[in-house]
Structures are given as C-alpha cells and as structure tokens.
Amino acid sequence: MKRTIIYICFVSLVTIICCIFNDEIVTLYYDAIRYFSNNDTTLEKNEYFREVDYMYVQNTSNYKPKNSKDIRNLFYTIINSGDDKFTFYCPRDYDNCLNDVKAIATNQTELSHINNFVHPFNGFKHIEIQYTSSGQVDVSIVRSYNDEEIEEISNKVEELYSRLVNPNMSVIDNIKVIHDHIINNSKYDTARSDYNMTTYKSDIAYGALIQGRAVCGGYSDAMALFLEKLGVKNFKISSDSHVWNAIYVDGVWYHLDLTWDDPVTSNNTDVLQHDYFMLSTSELHSKELEEHKFDETIYLEFKIQ
C-alpha cells in the first residue's frame, strides 16, 4: 500500500514537472513508469493455463523483453494465461522493441500459430494489441469460448470421458475410442465451409460435442479437450486452410486429423476412417500434401523427426 501511494505521488509530481521542463524530464518520467509498472506486473493464470513449453514458444515470467523471441514468448504466456487484459512496457535499452511488437501485432497468421499452442478454452477469437511511442503495449483478448459454453462443454467431456475411457486400455486405444466417438456423433458442416452459413458453432468444440456439427477447428478443439484429460501433451497444427491435432505419445509426435477421417460423401452417408490417425509427417504427406503443408520452422517438434 505504501509503495502504491509513493508511486501515485511520484507520477503526479513528475507529470506536473513535465509540463514545465524539457524532453529529458519527459524521458525520465517514462523510464519511471516503466520501472514501477514492470516491477509491479503480475499475470493471473486460470485453470486452463498450460505448464508446457514447446520448441517455438515457452512460458515466461520475464515481462521486460530483450529481443523478438522474448516478445513472442510473452504473447504466448499472455494468451496461455487466460487473462483478458495485460500491459507491458518496452525497456529503454531495447531500441527495436516497438518494431518487433508491431511485427507480431500486425501478423494475424503468426498470432494464430501462437494460439495453436494454448488450451482451447484460453484461445482467442480476437486479439487487439495497442502500443504507444513511449513503449507501452496493451493487449486485449476476446476468448473463443464464453463461460456458459465452457461449462456445458466441460460437463459433456466429463460425461463422455467417464463412459468411454478405459484405464485398462493403452493411451493410443483410448485416443482411438474418443476419435471414433467424435466422428460418429458429428457431421462435417458443409454449410459453413462452402457457404459461410453460421447456423452451428462448428468452428469450436461446442459444435462438435453439443450440436453435432463441426469443421476442422471444432474437431481439433474437441479432440484437444480429451487429450488434456488423458494427460497427453498436444497442440494444434495448421496450414493455410486447415487445422488438426499434434499429439505426443511414447516419446514420438504424431499427426491426428479427425476432419479427414470424417469424409463428406455424395449420398450423405456417415463414414468413419482411420487414414489420418497417428501419422508421421512423411506418412501424412504421402496421403495428402496440399492442405497439410505446414511451417516446420514453427511446428519444430516435427522437424526433428
């Protein structure tokens, strides 16, 4: 409390001085803002925070970035935390900080890739990043799922998990059971993919698990929720036009694509396949390359195979 009062008094005093004196005082003022703000910064983490580091992004407690990688990790940690608003400040000795912030903030593809590494419930629908010439960076996030959707989906996952998962079966066999259930109880939402009709929330797990309609985002989010409960390390992986699951089992990363295992047929009959179940990258690309061509500089776990 004492420190907060001192800080408020200091800022008020320096604000008055800045109105009277020169740019050097203004610089001193902003340096003080950075010092107090960065030292008082805390990031609240919700229950869906992933205590997991990946090769492309890692959690960080460093809110004073020194390079572009620090900034990327900070954005990952902010999104991963589930916090809706967060502010950090560029250090004065990091000359290119704002340019590096802008490079990520204006690159929706990069932000979407970062989003693939967080728990579905912490993923964003929209992210706004604002910055000032003084080095203040404000991040505001609208999540993909609201509280009501999370509660309904979580209840459904709990119900299905207790019914479908057998502790006496292997992890892979349990993943296959869940894979089959999601496909057998969902249809691919062609109205959304072909005509942009949004009758269903098929781009998120709500469509797949509650409404029985899904596109690739819905299939992959639904699968990710069960993988979390199984304790299987995972993330989503995306190309320019598609998204699917990456899973880590017995020391190996695999591709898992429920969308392509639930093909659309000309007579609208339901088909369950396992053609895209637990594949290596070479196996995946031997089957289909155009929609599964991904950036190996981002999804580095597959580059080392």
For the regions a protein language model found, what residue spans apply to each?
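N-terminal Sec-pathway targeting helices
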Residues: 1-16
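Catalytic cysteine-centered active-site loop
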Residues: 193-198, 202, 206, 213-215, ...
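Secondary-structure boundary elements
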Residues: 146-208
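Intrinsically disordered, low-complexity N-terminal segments that are enriched in acidic
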Residues: 22-138
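Secondary-structure transition/turn motif
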Residues: 140-147, 249, 259
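Acidic, metal-dependent phosphodiester-chemistry machinery of nucleic-acid enzymes
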Residues: 63-64, 207-210
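Low-complexity, Gly/Ser/Thr/Pro-rich intrinsically disordered linker/tail segments
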Residues: 269-305
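Hydrophobic/aromatic-rich core segments of domains that either
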Residues: 217-284
